[in-house]
Amino acid sequence: SIFKDLYEQKNFRGMKRDAMRAACIWIACWKHGCPRTSNEIADIFHIDKNSASLGCSSAEELLQSHERTMEQQDKSKLCSLKPSTFIERFSSRLELTVEQQLLAKFIAHQVEKKELIPDNRPQAIAAGILYFVSFYCKLPYSKMDIKLKLGDEASEVTINKCFKKLNEYKTLLLPSWVHSKYGASGSSSSGGKNNRKK
């Protein structure tokens, strides 16, 4: 098993047992189509984020090492990670309405389809999308609120960068009903105004 192999690897003997167990669960989640970030795994196992990140990276390296000589069809198939992967469960932390969740999913799919933000991690893009939705749906969440509620999956700076990029495509990403319902004008390109706290 991955856990046994991790435990026996000299390079990983400084790793805590909980981090090794967490890493194995992380791999299992990816293999079964329900990926979790190392930060989410850290929260589940109540371990520090650095230990979780180290454990997950080590487990991934070990898996790749073990499967290097295998035929492609026999290798573990880890599901792909996309912004839409995170939207539903990230949305639940913000208590978005069903309508707002569907809007966030629509935006995520558009971003993926057209590769609008190629330079950021999927979870960071998801955080940016949720701030974008929050901003245009007049929700009381600042970038710091999003950062904290999503467990530090993205920094305020990264969320703002993603927001700015999304804002460049707001005519593509925002259906007309958003403007009708919320009066979304998009007058602020940085997302720093709109009567929300910072």
Predicted regions and their residues:
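A cyclin-like helical interaction fold
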Residues: S1-A22, W26-D119, M144, L150, ...
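Amphipathic, charged-and-aliphatic alpha-helical interface segments
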Residues: A19-I27, A124-V133
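Extended serine/threonine-enriched, polar tracts that run as long, contiguous segments within proteins
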Residues: C137-K138
